[in-house]
Amino acid sequence: MPGKTAQKGGRPSGKGKKKKQTLKFTIDCTLPVEDGIMDASNFEQFLQERIKVNGKTKNLTTNIVIERKKSKVTVTSEIAFSKRYLKYLTKKYLKKNNLRDWLRVVAANKESYELRYFQINQDDEEEEDD
């Protein structure tokens, strides 16, 4: 065994290429779109204008693709992209269109968000009056 050298950490020698990661996030706007208070195509356009790549807006190139199927907006990224940043932009859109008081952004699962209405319980107020 004098010809072989032990490697630290048991990793293979040399630098290999990093595996290209593809991140895919969806935002489900079904409820507000069906009720007619929000336009999914307008939201898609907002994301295309506002998502920053390397500190610049409107710099999506081929790294980030935004697609819309009916009322679901999908953001596919080849570069590092935060799901939290997508939530931030969604909330910014809701605030801009005065929808922030009625809608909230909820994580449906690891890769998607959903726009839901706030639950307002009027039954509690009626019980307090008694």
Curated annotation (Swiss-Prot):
One Gene Ontology term of the molecular function aspect: structural constituent of ribosome
Domain of life: Eukaryota
Protein name stated in the entry: Large ribosomal subunit protein eL22
GO BP of this protein: cytoplasmic translation
Motif (Nuclear localization signal): 17-20
Species this chain originates from: Tripneustes gratilla (Hawaian sea urchin)
Pfam family, one: Ribosomal_L22e
Keywords: Ribonucleoprotein, Ribosomal protein
The encoding gene: RPL22
UniProt-listed InterPro entries: Ribosomal_eL22, Ribosomal_eL22_sf
Gene Ontology, cellular component aspect: ribonucleoprotein complex; ribosome
Residues covered by region (Disordered): 1-21
Transmembrane segments: none
Record Gene3D superfamilies: 3.30.1360.210
Similarity-based family: Belongs to the eukaryotic ribosomal protein eL22 family.
Disulfide bonds: none
